[in-house]
Amino acid sequence: MHELAVTESLLQVVLQHAGKGGAGKVVSVSVRIGELSDLVNEWMQRYFDYLSRGTIAEGALIRIERIPATFRCDACGDVFPADPRTREAIRCPCCASEAMTLVTGRECFVQQIEVT
């Protein structure tokens, strides 16, 4: 249940930026989350609803966009999508190497804040 801590941090970012802009109300928050983060959308919205009570973000909708996992082959440099949760070994589609570095898939950040 690390959604609570992550959502609390996201709310702080939202309130800080909305406050700087003189917003009266936060309508929605667009968040980009890597598919490997294991954050559950429903719980993030529930925690956001709970934590934002009494703030200008109360009632705001969280819009979550998932970022797919991509890897860079350490041998040839090719960047490709793959699901590391599969039981099969991940291999580079260009050279079949198993040596790779995660490029995307663990991110979590506020992309946009809609205010009135």
Regions found by a protein language model. Name each.
Residues 112-116:
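Short hydrophobic/aromatic patches at helix-to-coil boundaries
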Residues 66-67, 100:
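Structured, basic alpha/beta domains of bacterial-type, RNA-associated proteins
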Residues 79-80, 98-99:
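Cys/His-rich microdomains that often coordinate metals
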Residues 73-76, 92-95:
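Short cysteine-rich clusters marking metal-coordination/redox-active sites
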Residues 1, 77-79:
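Intrinsically disordered, low-complexity, mixed-charge
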Residues 71, 90, 108:
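Cys/His-enriched microdomains
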Residues 83-86, 102-105:
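Short Cys/His-rich "knuckle" micro-motifs
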Residues 1-63:
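Long, charged N-terminal interaction/targeting segments
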